[in-house]
């Protein structure tokens, strides 16, 4: 049996327990959450946490990296996931872009944790170019990119290559979710987190 040194034990993050409560419309999931909060060690974040099931979330990422792999698809899925995480991370106000403010709600650098998670999944980053990257750029930018190509200057951008196994994806995703919530759990002194509409 291996025994970890005391300093190693204190630095490791304890795995949390999760309870996912789902409903449809106003079917009462919040009442269920309020009831579960009454138990010792249970807590819930404010609002829904839908990173697993929303478009560009974890389910789409797994589908593209593990179940339906394609050379370009996996790069686009990672980009979409990181852009989605920007929305989840940033604050929102009346005159700003939409955001969910999870960096503040969870007491974590949401984007840093998301980038570290992706770093664990990818095999390499390389310079590449695909027309798919130009699908959503403005016409003027597309024009300049075409001109750049005409004069022999490439439009290569960093691209991701990731093909994790199902077990590796599951392990890293579990660690990622735990890293997102561990600061909040420590702050609130809870060991079981209730998530609304998570799956």
Regions found by a protein language model. Give the residues of each.
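PAPS-dependent sulfotransferase catalytic core
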Residues: 1-179
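Conserved helicase/translocase P-loop NTPase motor core
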Residues: 171-199
């Amino acid at each position: 049996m291996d025994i970890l040194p005391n300093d190693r034990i204190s630095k490791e993050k304890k795995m949390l327990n999760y309870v996912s409560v789902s409903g449809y419309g106003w079917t009462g999931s919040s009442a269920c959450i309020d009831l579960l909060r009454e138990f010792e060690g249970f807590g819930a974040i404010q609002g829904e946490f839908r990173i697993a099931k929303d478009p560009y979330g974890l389910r789409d990422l797994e589908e593209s990296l593990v179940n339906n792999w394609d050379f370009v698809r996996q790069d686009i899925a990672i980009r979409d996931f990181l852009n989605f995480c920007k929305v989840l991370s940033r604050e929102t106000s009346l005159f700003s872009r939409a955001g969910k403010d999870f960096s503040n709600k969870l007491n974590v650098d949401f984007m840093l944790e998301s980038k570290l998670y992706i770093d664990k999944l990818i095999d390499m980053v390389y310079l590449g170019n695909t027309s798919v990257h130009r699908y959503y750029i403005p016409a003027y930018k597309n024009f300049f990119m075409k001109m750049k190509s005409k004069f022999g200057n490439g439009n290569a951008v960093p691209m991701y290559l990731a093909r994790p196994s199902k077990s590796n994806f599951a392990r890293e995703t579990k660690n990622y979710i735990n890293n997102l919530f561990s600061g909040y759990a420590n702050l609130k002194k809870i060991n079981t987190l209730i998530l609304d509409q998570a799956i």
